């Protein structure tokens, strides 16, 4: 009788262990969509406008979830704020202007969690300076002695010293305002020119009654200022603790970006789904302008989507150190790493030139 009990106990013990092992094996083999997804919080640089489709598309199409990620995407209020919030740990990742990231690094050398850029999205800065033709401004040098307007944190305003040096522009005066008033003040004649993103301010000027043919636009990238624009940045804590999640994020993002660049009109549906009050046709134009001017630009095609040229990055670090008068010099190796980028084939997302 005792032997029989022992036999039964032994059988059930072995059976229980076998079931537990089988369950563990099934969990290991289960697809990422079945396992608990890794939560990631991402903040954009600005509102949900056309270019946000690059991030909303992979959410809408399930690319992030299929990669085992639960991505929360929030609008931003400027690159500087996004950099600060990733540094504080409020967000894991974000989209921010490379110059803003460099400025944060150089002004906060002892900060413990300085974000790092891990994929370039806007290969060229979207910064530009605008004027109305009625002002008589025809070349960048004509801004000498003029009154310019922009928010104090505007990327073009902060990098104005570089643009002025490259184009031999004399002293100018600045008027500060909140972003919604920038284009209004130019149309009213309160200022002679404004700085802003090329695909934002032009459309805003049109919305305020100006005609595109009556606006003079000088993109920084086409006038001697080859700064990088917005990049995906990440918390070093995330990079250290979950590098595989970072790699999965960038791979899924690249997949979505390829779809957006191939069919931008269709991709705006993802933006409309997130913000139902957008003007669809306006945001289609904005997205296409961003693609042409900063995402699939000649420089982006030469360097490859998502990547940077080390020499160009080093030059930018030096330029930002000077123009922004940072406390310490920017170390280009500290602000960028290509270690998490997808393969070359997965980064082949740019549409054929001319399309």
Annotate each language-model stretch with its function:
Residues 99-100, 108, 181-280:
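Pocket-lining segment of extracytoplasmic ligand-binding domains
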Residues 29-36:
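Sec/Tat signal peptide C-region and signal peptidase I cleavage site
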Residues 74, 117, 174, 260-270, ...:
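Surface-exposed patches in mature extracellular/periplasmic domains of secreted proteins
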Residues 241-325:
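Secondary-structure end/capping motifs
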Residues 313-355:
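Conserved C-terminal helix/tail region of periplasmic/extracytoplasmic solute-binding proteins
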Residues 36-188, 192-199, 218-220, 225-226:
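Short, glycine-/small- and polar/acidic-enriched structural segments
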Residues 171-174, 212-216, 277-288, 326-335:
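Short, surface-exposed acidic
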Residues 3-27:
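Twin-arginine (Tat) signal peptide motif
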């Amino acid at each position: 009788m005792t032997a029989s009990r022992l036999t039964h106990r032994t059988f059930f013990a072995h059976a229980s262990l076998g079931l537990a092992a089988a369950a563990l094996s099934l969990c290991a083999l289960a697809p990422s969509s079945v396992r608990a997804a890794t939560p990631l919080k991402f903040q954009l640089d600005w509102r949900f406008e056309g270019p946000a489709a690059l991030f909303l598309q992979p959410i809408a199409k399930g690319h992030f979830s299929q990669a085992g990620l639960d991505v929360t995407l929030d609008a931003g209020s400027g690159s500087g704020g996004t950099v600060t919030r990733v540094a504080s740990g409020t967000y894991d990742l974000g989209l921010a202007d490379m110059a803003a990231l460099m400025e944060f690094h150089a002004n906060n050398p002892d900060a413990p969690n300085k974000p790092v850029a891990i994929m370039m999205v806007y290969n060229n800065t979207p910064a530009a300076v605008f004027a109305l033709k009625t002002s008589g401004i025809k070349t960048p040098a004509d801004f000498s002695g003029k009154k310019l307007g922009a928010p104090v944190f505007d990327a073009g305003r902060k990098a104005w010293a570089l643009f002025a040096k490259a184009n031999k522009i004399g002293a100018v005066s600045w008027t500060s305002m909140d972003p919604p008033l920038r284009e209004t003040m130019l149309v009213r004649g309160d200022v002679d020119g404004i700085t802003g993103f090329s695909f934002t301010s032009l459309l805003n000027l049109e919305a305020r009654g100006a005609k595109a043919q009556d606006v003079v636009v000088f993109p920084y990238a086409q006038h001697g200022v080859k700064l990088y624009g917005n990049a995906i940045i990440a918390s070093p804590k995330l990079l250290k603790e979950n590098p595989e999640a970072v790699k999965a994020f960038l791979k899924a993002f690249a997949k979505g970006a390829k779809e957006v660049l191939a069919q931008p009109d269709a991709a705006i549906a993802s933006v409309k789904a997130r913000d139902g009050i957008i003007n669809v046709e306006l945001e289609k134009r904005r997205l296409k302008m961003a693609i042409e001017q900063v995402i699939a630009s000649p420089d982006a095609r030469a360097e490859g989507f998502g990547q940077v040229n080390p020499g160009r990055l080093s030059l930018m670090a030096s330029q930002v150190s000077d123009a922004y008068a940072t406390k310490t010099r920017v170390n280009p190796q500290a602000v960028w790493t290509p270690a998490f980028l997808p393969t070359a084939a997965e980064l082949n997302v740019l549409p054929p030139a001319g399309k």
